[in-house]
Regions:
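Ligand/cofactor-recognition surfaces for anionic moieties
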Residues: 1-761
Length: 761
């Protein structure tokens, strides 16, 4: 059977068997790290004298048959096989066991060393070299860098029977300044969309002093391997937007030495925004060192997939990238900004039969991330009275009187509360209705509207991504065909009070199919919907958008699930506008959509206050009869029997018997026990009483603080749905029962729950 080598991993490294097509060599080196493999292949090619070398990625050797084939065709003919295994034996257990067996049968030397800082005794037992030799090999890679890997090649050649000069490994710093990616601000911070760095008219010294500051952090391993082109490209993009940039490499954000250096840098440099390319979560009880800047932390990904795989995928991020660069960093309160690079073959290294793979910058996404950083830094530096904000309300479902509907939130009163909050914080907010019903009536009846002329819309629409506009035209036709177009313009009902505009989110599709299309991941938005966001960004020139309540439609529009691209609808419409999203705390799954697809900062708000459900009249009658039965059971057994019959009659009449699976054939004691248990559960159940007003209740101050901190370009503490922190008992009391479980309880026994409980629905 002949197996073809695959060009590169796809979106997810699948485990199909492959033949790498390599020929035997005296030394074989295997690793999960493309950067490490590429650097070693480059160094070997610089002096391709004997012994020969083969480099291969362990990611290509996941299938057992691939392992068997590689050992048979390449490894068993070698004199020395070195494996650098990230994650311990469990990540490549079959390969470790088979290589260990082959080494002892065929007589080649085997060294399997950890791919990180953590030792694994199982790897040492599988190896055939001495502990000293294994420790030396591990140190070459742990210290890293070209000089140490050059010494490794010399030491490996010596072990393989060709004495070669080598030096003991020299430790490299665990953290440091990456000079190649540091930039001094030479011009002023350009205004949005400005291309001329000198447009402000300030002196160069004043411009440099007033320039925003960005701190970029990335992994030491990329610096040691010289594989940080995306970081340099990002620094250039930030610098073009007026930033002073400091870039630092770190072994880990949790390492004490790295923490110390970053803490000192943050204190001296005082960044307005941080762009972090390290993965996983770095948060401890005391938070992360990056929190000390009290600035937004944009999480960026150096993706492990190829650009082609990403471009052709609806998911966007593969499993590893999603976990490492998206999901886990959310725990630290980072704002996911997207991928800035993808893996690419840069050149073929014939001497080691290895195709060099490095991180290739993705220009469109680097520009998007730089714009996002600029706008968050702008929020941080602008005075509150200068900021232009939009407060957008959901408009679901399609029933009159439900405009601005959000799960668990009293939207009209929350609008008033947020207006008051912003006004008290010195935002330029005019007077607003004091009655929430009047607010909603003004929006629903279009008492005031703004418009985007068709000609202006067509001009802006022509600047959007071609793939996106093709989808829109295919679904909805030309802009002139949109029913919302009136008198040559798209009109939007809104309330303008100073520098705050309040509006209902337009329909993303046809009004009659709102419920069906609300979460449609395939249907492109209609022209009127697009026009609304273009008006906010280009005509209104908002600095930030607040979307109030769970939930809107922007984050559900077509596009990739994570790591969006320039044609994905949420990125096309929102652009690099900071999105702040008050979201109910007990729905983190849907909050994740906004975080991952719209770079939202979610501000968790509490569920409605909880009250006891209570019992309906028939249920109260049964409860009273059960009390009577309990008293009679010991004092008057004959009366107890009659009471029990009455209880069962009432239970049958009310439907409770069926709910508790009680029939006339059920043992009487068992039947009464079931009825009693059910009544106790329902009576003690707590359900929502009314709706929550943003900024009110036990966590109200934290909710308000979270919103104001986000709008000020400061760091927002993470939590459920981006929730404000509260003491555990309060959170337990307030969010003990999710809306889903309450709905399920209502479905189980609607007749037996009191009218007051039903009204709370």
């Amino acid at each position: 059977m002949h197996l073809l080598a695959r060009d590169l991993h796809g979106l997810d490294d699948n485990e199909a068997a492959v033949d790498l097509g390599q020929t035997p060599a005296q030394i074989v080196f295997l690793s999960f790290s493309d950067a490490e493999l590429s650097l070693l292949a480059e160094l070997h090619e610089q002096n391709a004298a004997p012994p020969s070398l083969r480099c291969a990625s362990l990611a290509r050797l996941k299938h057992p048959y691939s392992v068997d084939l590689y050992i048979d065709k390449v490894a068993r003919h070698a004199r020395l096989v070195v494996v650098r295994l990230l994650g311990g034996k469990d990540y490549w257990a079959y390969g470790v066991d088979e290589l260990a067996t082959a080494a002892r049968m065929r007589g080649f030397a085997l060294a399997i060393v950890p791919g990180d800082m953590h030792s694994d005794e199982r790897l040492e037992r599988a190896s055939t070299l001495s502990s000293d030799a294994l420790a030396r090999i591990w140190s070459f890679f742990r210290d890293g860098g070209p000089d140490n890997l050059r010494s490794f090649l010399g030491y490996a050649a010596t072990l393989a029977g060709t004495p070669t000069h080598w030096l003991e490994s020299a430790p490299a710093p665990l953290a440091g300044r990456c000079e190649q990616a540091c930039r001094t601000a030479l011009g002023a911070n350009p205004p949005p969309h400005a291309e001329d760095e000198g447009a402000s008219g300030q002196s160069s010294g004043a411009q440099a002093a007033s320039a925003p500051r960005a701190l970029v952090t990335f992994y030491r391993s990329a610096w040691l391997a010289g594989d940080f082109a995306p970081i340099v490209a990002l620094a250039d993009a930030l610098h073009k937007r007026g930033f002073a940039v400091e870039a630092y490499f770190v072994a880990s954000l949790k390492d004490a030495a790295c923490e110390t250096l970053l803490a000192q840098t943050i204190a001296e440099f005082r960044p307005d925004v941080i762009l972090n390319a390290t993965a996983f979560s770095a948060r401890t009880e005391g938070g992360s060192v990056l929190d000390r800047a009290d600035a937004p932390v944009l999480q960026i990904a150096l993706a492990t997939s190829t650009r082609e795989a990403w471009e052709n995928s609806k998911r966007g991020a593969n499993g590893a990238d999603l976990a490492m660069n998206v999901v886990l960093p959310e725990v630290d309160g980072r704002i996911f900004a997207g991928a800035v690079s993808f893996k690419a073959q840069t050149r073929a290294r014939a001497a080691s039969e290895f195709d060099e793979i490095r991180h290739s910058p993705e220009p469109s996404q680097i520009d998007h991330v730089a714009a996002l950083a600029q706008n968050w830094a702008r929020l941080r530096r602008l005075g509150h009275s200068e900021k232009r904000l939009a407060l957008v309300l959901s408009d679901y479902p399609a029933r009159r009187g439900r405009g601005g509907y959000a799960i668990g939130l009293d939207t009209p009163r929350s609008v008033i509360a947020i207006g008051d909050l912003l006004r008290d914080a010195d935002y330029e907010i005019g007077s607003l209705y004091r009655d929430g019903d009047l607010v909603m009536r003004a929006l629903e009846e279009a008492a005031h509207y703004v418009e985007l002329p068709l000609a202006e819309y067509q001009r802006l629409f022509a600047t959007l991504a071609d793939d996106f506009t093709r989808q829109v035209l295919a679904a909805w036709g030309a802009p002139e065909e949109d029913p919302a177009l009136a008198k040559g313009a798209f009109r939007f009902s809104c309330i303008e009070i100073g520098k705050l505009v309040i509006a209902l989110q337009p329909d993303r599709g046809s009004r009659v199919e709102r419920r069906e299309t609300y979460h449609d991941a395939e249907l492109a938005p209609r022209h009127a919907y697009i026009a609304f966001y273009l008006w906010l960004r280009h005509s209104r020139s908002i600095d930030a958008l607040i979307h109030l309540g769970t939930h809107g439609t922007l984050e559900w529009l077509p596009g990739k699930s994570a790591m969006l691209g320039p044609s994905c609808a949420p990125q096309v419409l929102l652009g690099a506008t900071p999105l702040v999203y008050p979201f109910i705390v007990n729905d983190p799954g849907e909050a994740a959509q906004a975080k991952r697809r719209a770079s939202a900062v979610t501000i968790g708000h509490m569920t409605p206050p909880l009250v006891e459900a209570g019992l309906a009249a028939e249920a109260e009658e049964i409860e009273s009869l059960l009390d009577e039965y309990a008293s009679a059971a010991t004092l008057d057994p004959r009366r107890a029997k009659l009471v029990a019959e009455t209880i069962l009659d009432v239970a049958e009449r009310s439907g409770l018997a069926q709910e508790c699976e009680v029939t006339r054939d059920t043992d009487r004691a068992e039947a009464l026990a079931r009825l009693d248990a059910w009544l106790c559960d329902v009576k003690e159940m707590r359900i929502g009483d009314g709706l929550h007003i943003f900024g009110d209740g036990p966590c109200g101050a934290a909710e308000a603080s979270g919103l104001l901190r986000a709008l000020a370009g400061r760091f927002v503490e993470p939590g459920p749905a981006g929730a404000p922190r509260a003491d555990a008992p309060t959170l337990c009391r307030q969010a003990a029962i999710s809306s889903a479980s309450i709905r399920a309880m209502f479905r189980r026994a609607p007749p037996m729950i009191s009218a007051s409980a039903r009204r709370a629905r």
